Structures are given as structure tokens and as C-alpha cells.
Amino acid sequence: LGDSYLSGPQQLFKRFTFLLSEAGAAREQAKKESLLRGAVRELEKLRTLVRRGSAYLTERLEAKAGEPDANPLYDALGGVRKKEELEALGLTLAETALLQLAFEVRYDEAKREFLDLGHWISLSDGTLYREMNFRPLSAKNYIAEKDSSDRRLRAERFPYYPAFPGEAARIRLEDATAEQPEAADFARIIGFAAPIAQAVKQAAKALQSVLAEDKAPALLQLSDVAVKEDAVYLRDAAGSLL
């Protein structure tokens, strides 16, 4: 169909059918139930996106609006934004520096795609952002793999993408200058860390949005970390446990 379909709903449907297929082949009951819960979650996302996306597109058509707006539904439906479009919408982070807190590589079997995911923090206000580099298997020889970074990044403007309430926005870092971080930067980051109760409250708010990312990053203020068998236990100064 070329450009005559919306890639966002298609990807959700692919993941839904993939999880159903995996659940049917699973022998362990616990794994089967986990896969089925995941399939239901994808179906819930698909239903929500169809309902909200249809209303959004109808409104845009009636208004004869052809240019992308700052609604994250545009991205969820599969819209692709250029850096210049983000800047034109005023979606830029200015006069700040960023440091990476964590880095991971995920693989989505349903999409047959790797995701290099960097979690960054603004040294100005402690806001968390995500750098996302998508690498489909079909284009693995043409898209460079990202790596972790221990440098402070600075730019005149960092463009970022619209996000659902409470969700860490995706940010673009290609025009940034890398610098050696200072001790004061790490002290500032520690000052932004939240106690467990506050972080859980913020994460719960982010996860209320069906179309938002399933995982909510948080910078925790901890006093103890313990590992027992396959579980990690966290405690903060107030005695809260996670």
C-alpha cells in the first residue's frame, strides 16, 4: 500500500499477533500468561489509537491542516518528523547541557528492529529525555549503532519530540558538542534524585496513558541496594522499599 497506510497501528497489530503466536507455542503456564497479558496490552493500545487517532485525523481534515502539529498522536500513528519541523513548532530545549544516566539496546522481534536507547538528564532542571536510534534488521548495514556516552553534551538547541503526559520525551543530539563533565555536574544530578514514593507517583502518572511507553524511567535517591536470587531490592533514606 505504500504511503496509504498508517505504520503506527500496523506495528501494534504485528506485535499483538506475534505475542498471541508465542503464547500458543509456550509450554510453561507462567510464560503463556505473561505473553497473553502482553497481547491484551497491545490490543488495548491499538483500540485506543484507532479511537483517538480517528478523531484526531478527522479534526485535522476538517481544519484542512496539512502541516504536522505538536500532538503526540501524530507520532503514534506513524508520522515522521524532520528536525526543522520540530524547531518550527518550538519543540527545542535551549541553554542547557545533558548527561547520560543509562544506555541499553532492545530488540523488538515483532518489528525485527533494534533500538539503541539512551537515558539523558538535563543539568538545568533534572528533566529526563530519551535518545532513540532505530535499526531495522533489513537496514542493519546502513544505520550506525549507538554506544553509551560519558561526555556532557551541549548545543544551542536540542530538538525534542512531543510526548504523552508524564512520558520522557525523545530528544535529538546530533548537533551537540561533547565536553568533559565536571564534579559539580554529578553533584547536581544527585540533587535531582527523587525518593521512591515520589518517583513511583510520577511513574504511575506516566503509565496511565495507554499510548505512552510501557516503562517509565526515574532517577532514584537510594540509601541501600540489595540483590537476592533474581530480585533487586531498593531502599531510600525514608525507609521506603521497592
Walk through the language-model features, giving the residues of each.
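Helix-loop junction hotspots and adjacent acidic micro-motifs that serve as functional foci
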Residues: L1-L242
